[in-house]
Amino acid sequence: MGKRILIVDDAAFMRMMIKDSLNKYRYHVLGEAENGAKGVEKYNELKPDLVLMDITMPELDGIQALKKIKSMDASATVIMCSAMGQQAMVIESIQAGAKDFIVKPFQADRVLEAVKKVVG
């Protein structure tokens, strides 16, 4: 069984695209969430090896969700994905504990490269 991954993004098509790409390479997407609050809940429930998380989402944005997850589990592994590739967002994500940052729109290869680098 491959690494277990949680995808958190408010866009269903984005979750599906990422899931399809990861499944092809034997990664196991064990859950999805459509906002940061649900992402934190799913993280607690599923304890994935990796979280791929969007930044701009309703209820709780990705950076707030990242901070909550890291406060509960300092060893949590999170990669942020967002169309907002501004330097400040990248820096804030990394300072909050993200292992990598993927700028949308991205190719499947970029997601796979980041996942391999972070969890193998």
Question: What residue spans do the PLM features occupy?
Answer:
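Active-site beta3 strand of CheY-like receiver
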Residues: L46-L52
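Receiver (REC) domain active-site loop signature in two-component systems and cognate sites
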Residues: M57
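Acidic catalytic/metal-coordinating carboxylates
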Residues: N35-K38, D61-Q64
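Short, conserved "switch-loop" micro-motifs in signal-transduction and mechanochemical regulators
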Residues: M84-G85
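Two-component/phosphorelay signaling modules centered on CheY-like receiver
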Residues: A12-G31
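C-terminal output helix
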Residues: F106-V115
